[in-house]
Amino acid sequence: SDLDAHISLKPTAFGLTIDYDYALKTLSGIARKAHESNIYVRLDMEDSNHTESTLKIMEDLYSEGHLNIGVVLQGRLFRTKDDLKRIAEKMGQHADVRICKGIYLESSEIAYTSYSDIVSATSEAVETALDLGMYVGIASHDHPVINGALLNLQSRGILPEKPDPRKPAPLVKPGKGEGYEFQFLLGVRGDVRRRLASDGHLTRVYLPYGKQWYEYSMRRLRENPGIAWHVAKSVIMPWTNRR
């Protein structure tokens, strides 16, 4: 297919919490098959109980030779900067992360809990990832995070449709941009996404797929009611979110 699309998977859906070796074998097979079609596989991050095991399985997949593997990190967790350094050390120019705020409610002992602190921490995580030479998927609908990322990119000379000037820079992969991209949930902030795209930035839309797409979407709305208006607006007035 000529469709420029990648895959995001939740490792727990493939047995991560039941049988690690089985999950590794299954995800390895998926990564191998995806590679045949130049498809990138992203391991979604769930709550903090699964952070370490998700990172480990990503590292094990990379050690097996899968270079089309990346992970998601949540800006709100205190450990995220150390995790970024860990990934950069392990994967070098193949390091590829999606950074989001995180939707899971976490203890104040391990995570920031106020909106302002979460936004600041997420912006700092993006900055750290850029400084570590990673490919960064900036996955936020929050204007402060997006605007902060744009300033950080500009200050480092990382510009739309231009070669990444970082040394070393992340390796360019099929379907990827030069060092970064912006990512949005389907139906959320379509106006912002279109503006970024018109300015030359690579943007990507997260699209739920499969038999349980509706259940998944409803769960996301319960976990993050702040996006409910954007989704409802795109349903009632679909012309506001057209590409």
Segments (PLM) and residue ranges:
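Positively charged, amphipathic and often flexible ligand-engagement surfaces
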Residues: 1-243
